[in-house]
Amino acid sequence: MKTSKVAIDASFLLKLFLPEDSSDQVEHQWRDWIENSVEVIAPTLIVFEASSVLRNKVFRGILDDADATEMIDRIRHLDLSLIYAQELIELAWGMGAILKAPTLYDCFYLAVAKLFKVPFWTSDKKLYKSAKKEFPFVNLL
């Protein structure tokens, strides 16, 4: 049984599949959560955003289509709880106003963490810098 939760965003998730700075730390953190029965949660948006990033990398010739397709299949089978709740819309909207954000994509990730009162992990330095002061549950890896 899962005893605790953490929330993640697409930048964190994609580092499990794409070799980038801090990918090793992200993989280590993910394994630690799974081994310790931590439930990893994210808004359903994460699947769309991660798939879109991979598609863009294929389009730009950075990734092979077959490799990207395999990554998407692996994402689909991850031990990741996808969250959709009506409350997310209102929370994300309010967080967007606080952060003066032009879009709400990142705010939906923050809203999941706020709704479930759990730590939020991102690999997006810009998001971390803009949100950490207002939302101390935000962590960067």
Q: For each predicted feature, which ranges?
A:
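Acidic, PIN/NYN-like endoribonuclease modules and their adjacent C-terminal/linker elements
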Residues: 1-5, 98, 110-141
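Short, well-structured N-terminal submotif of metal-dependent ribonuclease cores
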Residues: 1-45, 57-70
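Short beta-strand scaffold positions
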Residues: 8, 41-42, 83, 104-107, ...
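A general alpha-helix detector
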Residues: 12-13, 49-54, 71-75, 91-92, ...
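Alpha-helix capping/helix-boundary segments
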Residues: 12-13, 46, 87-88, 108-109, ...
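Phosphate- and divalent-cation-binding pockets in alpha/beta enzyme and binding domains
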Residues: 25, 49, 91, 129-130
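Acidic catalytic patch
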Residues: 44, 67-99
